[in-house]
């Protein structure tokens, strides 16, 4: 297990090497595009080394290497079946990452020299090996964003070969140990790379990536007190960072199955890569591509133990009348507004909550707490009819890429037991460390919020347990300042002291003017 110092050293080394790789591609394409090549190469190396590790383990007693077993016509089918069953894919020995690197750096003749087409074939062979197998759901189209024939890599095959070859060699120099589950290479790489493109014109990293602090907070709140989770879901999963974060906060770190849905094709691929690189077997996750609000890929029967989500804020959606018959949205009698789909995502999550002990932690803009019309009706339905809303937590501004607005966390539970007659409000807007470009929610801030949530007590200027009579009196308006008074009284002003100070200043001013006039008379002015 890596300690904190080891982790930081690994992260610093990775950061330096990623910058070096990024500089190989800089100027030839947009940063948000070259990340796809770097992550794709890192991911392929991971799959390759995982193959080698697994094959060495199962072939140890037979005393043969993977190359020898694969070359044997009698042995090969068994080896391929083992790899497909366990890993979900097959990488031929000649396509192993180390063998491709050897062709780049140690070729003995032109016939053995690496070409970008070798890497393209290796990827196609890998994905092709999953065709007709259940694992295809996890690997189909996974490398689509790494366009190895793109002219921006080079006008000729030789130019593209040189460019990709240099990136592959630099990736081969990154030191990561597959046995070291404490160091998340892909996740760390993604966080570094997102910094390169999140501020680019027209690019919003927040669409794909939830910073570590808010992600950790939601995962902790939603999994509090759970030993394990049968099912975990994120209906706008982005890079799947929040999905994976939940597992870390379960007592046993056990999740039966992960579910996610993502609209953006590039991010959909990244989320599947992230699951695999975190050691989640292909059998244990289903990430779907599609529009969650329009096309629920989960299906009617799926019920989830834990759900976390950071949906796109105030998204426009059709709010078509047909959705009035959708069981996810029909309960409130009104649809979320066309210009603000925020509560439609909440209704989707409520629909998929496990009835026995379902939990949700979702990040949303503050507008959902107090806007009227349809949103007021939906809030009332969630609170009064369903009794699912457990807590409202206000977070600091400027925590996210691409937006400086403050957001809140809504915590919902299907079984609220003794808390069914109240809602907890927490104002954590001052809980942050100021950063250069972005505020940071650190562990001490998360601990303070989670502790207040767990204790569920009134804390002056920080937390308030509001009973239902207060909620009703406020017309189901959940605006946090209505419940948590953060007003700081100013010290009383001593009027006599102020008058004396003014008198002194007047005297000093008059003396200065008299002195200036005296100088001017002496100068004849």
Locate predicted features.
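Non-catalytic, mostly N-terminal accessory regions of nucleic-acid modification and defense proteins
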Residues: 1-217, 222, 286-292, 394-398, ...
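A conserved structural/catalytic subdomain of Rossmann-like adenosyl-cofactor enzymes
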Residues: 3-9, 75, 295, 301-525
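Short small-residue beta-strand/loop micro-motif enriched in glycine and branched aliphatics
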Residues: 198-201, 254-256, 433-434
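Conserved S-adenosyl-L-methionine
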Residues: 204-309, 314-323, 329-332, 343-344, ...
């Amino acid at each position: 297990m890596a300690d904190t110092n080891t982790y930081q050293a690994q992260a610093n080394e990775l950061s330096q090497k990623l910058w070096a790789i990024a500089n190989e591609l800089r100027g030839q394409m947009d940063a948000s595009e070259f990340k796809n090549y770097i992550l794709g190469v890192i991911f392929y190396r991971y799959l390759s080394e995982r193959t080698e590790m697994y094959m060495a383990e199962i072939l140890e007693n037979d005393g043969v290497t993977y190359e020898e077993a694969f070359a044997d016509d009698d042995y090969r089918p068994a080896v391929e079946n083992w790899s497909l069953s366990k890993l979900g894919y097959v990488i031929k020995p000649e396509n192993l990452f180390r063998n491709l690197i050897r062709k780049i750096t140690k070729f003995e003749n032109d016939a053995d020299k690496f070409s970008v087409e070798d890497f393209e074939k290796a990827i196609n062979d890998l994905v092709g090996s999953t065709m007709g197998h259940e694992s295809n759901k996890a690997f189909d189209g996974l490398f689509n964003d790494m366009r190895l024939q793109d002219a921006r890599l080079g006008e000729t095959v030789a130019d593209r070969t040189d460019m990709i070859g240099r990136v592959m060699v630099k990736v081969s120099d990154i030191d990561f140990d597959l046995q070291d589950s404490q160091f998340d290479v892909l996740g760390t790489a993604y966080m570094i790379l997102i910094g390169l493109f999140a501020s680019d014109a027209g690019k919003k990293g927040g669409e794909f990536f939830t910073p570590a602090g808010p992600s950790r907070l939601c995962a902790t709140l939603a999994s509090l007190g759970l030993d394990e989770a049968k099912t975990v879901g994120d209906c706008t999963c982005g890079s799947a960072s929040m999905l994976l974060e939940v597992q870390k906060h379960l007592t046993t770190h056990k999740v039966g199955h992960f579910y996610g849905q993502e609209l953006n094709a590039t991010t959909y691929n990244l989320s599947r890569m992230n699951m695999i690189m975190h050691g989640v077997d292909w059998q244990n996750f289903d990430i779907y591509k599609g529009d969650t609000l329009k096309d629920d890929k989960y299906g009617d029967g799926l019920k989830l133990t834990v759900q976390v989500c950071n949906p796109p804020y105030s998204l426009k959606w059709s709010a078509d009348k047909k959705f009035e018959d959708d069981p996810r949205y029909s309960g409130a009698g009104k649809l979320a507004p066309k210009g603000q789909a925020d509560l439609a995502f909440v209704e989707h999550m409520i629909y998929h909550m496990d009835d026995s002990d379902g939990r949700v932690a979702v990040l949303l803009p503050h507008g959902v707490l107090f806007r009227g019309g349809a949103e007021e009706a939906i809030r009332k339905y969630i609170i009064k009819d369903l009794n699912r809303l457990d807590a409202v937590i206000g977070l600091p501004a400027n925590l996210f890429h691409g937006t400086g607005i403050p957001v809140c966390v809504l915590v919902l539970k299907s079984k609220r037991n003794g808390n069914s007659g109240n809602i907890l409000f927490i104002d954590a807007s001052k809980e942050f460390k100021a950063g250069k470009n972005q505020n940071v929610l650190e562990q001490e801030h998360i601990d303070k919020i989670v502790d207040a949530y767990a204790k569920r007590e009134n804390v002056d200027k920080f937390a308030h347990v509001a009973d239902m009579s207060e909620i009703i009196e406020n017309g189901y308006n959940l605006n946090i300042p209505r419940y948590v008074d953060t007003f700081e009284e100013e010290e009383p002003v001593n009027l006599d002291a102020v008058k004396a100070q003014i008198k002194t200043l007047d005297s000093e001013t008059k003396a200065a003017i008299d002195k200036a006039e005296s100088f001017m008379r002496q100068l004849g002015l």
